[in-house]
Amino acid sequence: MRHNSLSTLLTTGLAAATLMASGQVLAYGAGDFFTRVGVAKVEPKSDNGSLAGGAFTVDVQDKTDFAFTLGYRFHDKMGIELLAALPFEHDIALNGDNLASTKHLPPTLTLQYYPLGGTDARVQPYVGAGINYTFFSDEELAIGELELDDSWGAAAQVGIDLLIDENWALNAAAWYIDIDTDATINGAAAGTVEIDPLVVMAGLSYRF
């Protein structure tokens, strides 16, 4: 599922680039602030571990919602970007039954490299690496009380801007985020939930 989403993202981006009219567009460069806004799908990995000594297998469900980023280019080829979003609410299946849920906020800060930065190329790919902090809230469990600890983890990113004019671009991006949270059920330590999602986002980019 992850490979299909990433392949679709890149294929769509390249196809859109070939349809854009030829001509030069001023690319993003040093000193630019930008925002990216769109719809993001959070796809946790397929095996999220087990709880209560193996009594419950865990399956964290996918979720799609609004997301946005804020970024700054401190060099033609280098920048930083913060991924933010509305709280994502995930159903959690235990032994195949949806018995739990949680909300989380996953702000993710990445240092980015733009190989074509500072040029007038309409297609501007980039890669990034950084750190994530995930805040969990509103945990619910049908068979008791659930608590999930906040999480720190590494993050990696790949994306592409398809420039429309000096301010606007189409954008597609994907992040891999390391999210592991310790779970407590009815006050007792129950194990670790390994979410480790792929986040795929598509939308618009605007340069200020």
Residue spans for each PLM region:
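Bacterial N-terminal signal peptides that target proteins for export
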Residues: 2-11
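Gram-negative (and chloroplast) outer-membrane scaffold detector with strong preference
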Residues: 30-32, 39-41, 45, 69-141, ...
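Outer-membrane beta-barrel translocator domains and adjoining extracellular loop/strand segments
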Residues: 47-54, 91-98, 137-146, 182-189
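N-terminal targeting signals for Sec/Tat export/insertion, comprising classic cleavable signal peptides
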Residues: 36-66
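Predominantly the C-terminal beta-signal and adjacent terminal strand-loop region
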Residues: 89-91, 101, 165-208
